[in-house]
Amino acid sequence: MNILITGVHGFVGSNLVKYLSKENTIYGLDIVQPQKDGVKKTFSWDELEQPNAMPEIDAIIHLAGKAHDTRNKSAADVYFKVNTGLTQKIFDWYMASATAKKFVFFSTAKAAAECVPEILLEDVTPTPKGPYGESKIKAEEYILDALEKQGVSRKSMSSIVPGTDCPKNGKDVYIFRPCMIHGPGNKGNLNLLYGVVSKGIPWPLGAFENRRTFTSVENICFAVNGVLTQDVPSGIYNMGDDEALSTNELIEVICETLGKKAHIWRIPKGFMNGVAKVGGWLHLPLNPLRMQKLTENYVSSNAKIKKALGIKKFPVDARQGLKQTIACFAKQ
C-alpha cells in the first residue's frame, strides 16, 4: 500500500513510519523535506498542487497541524490557517484522487469538548473553546459536509457505534479524536510533570482528585493500521488507552519507574489556583491552562474504535505505556 503521511517528521508521524513502513511504501508531505528512514520521498505542500508531481496513493494519514500552545502566545489565525486550511487542501486532493480510498484525519478530543463532566462519547455536540479546538472542529465540519454529499450522514459518523452509511464514491474517512498522546520521545505536559517529580520536588496538587484518559502512541499506530487494513466503517472515533488515571496515580507511576518514593502534598485547591493565576501573569511554567490540563477530569470512551477493530483491549495498557515514556525521559 502506498501511504502519504502529512506532518511525517512529527512525533506521531515518526512513530507511524516505523510501524507501517515494514509492509507499505511511505511518502511524506511536510514543510521540510529532509531524508527520513522508512520514507521513500517527502513532498512539499506546493508540490501537492502541481500536476503529476505526486505518486499514486492508496491512503492518506493527515497529521500536519499546529499543536495546542499552553503558553497562549500563538495568534488565533495561525491555528485556522494550519489546522483548518491544510486539512481542506489535503482532503480536496484526496477526494479528487483516482486511487486513494482511505483518509485518516487526526483531530483532537478538545474539538469535542474542553471539559468532560462524565465520559466523552462520539455523539457529543462539539463545544470547543479557544482557537486550537475551534480550528480542528471547523476542519471536521468541512469533511463532514463533503461526506454528506456522498451519502454519509453526520449521525452515522458521530454514532457511538460504528456507522452503517457507505460513501458512494468508495472513499472511507476516519476522524480520530485522541486525548493527550504519550510515548518515548514525546515532550509536553508529561515532560514538565516528570521534571518536577524526578528532582524530588513534592507534588503540590494532590488535593485535586481527577481522572483522565491518555493515549499511547503505540495504540494509535495499532488503530491506524487497523482502519487501513480492515473493512472499518467511516466515522468519528475517540482515541485513548483503556484505563483512565488520576494525576496522583501518574505521579506514582513516575516514581515507581524511577525507583523513588512519591511525595504528594494536598495543598488547598484555592491556594494553588491562585499560584497558577500568578504564573500566568509572569509566564511561569504553571499557569491556569497547564493547571487545568494537570488536574481536570477528562475521560474518553474508546468503545467505538475497539468494536470497529474487533478487539476487547488495546495492546498497550495506560500504565505500561506511561512507564515506557517515563523511562525514555530518564535516559535523556
What are these regions (language model features)?
Residues 45-84, 89, 93, 111:
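NAD(P)H-binding glycine-rich loop region in Rossmannoid oxidoreductase-like domains
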Residues 89-131, 147-157:
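Conserved Rossmann-fold NAD(P)-dependent oxidoreductase catalytic core, especially the SDR/UDP-sugar
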Residues 162, 230-286, 322-326, 330:
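Mid/C-terminal beta-alpha module of Rossmann-like enzyme folds, strongest
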Residues 186-192, 206-228, 234-235:
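Substrate-positioning beta->alpha
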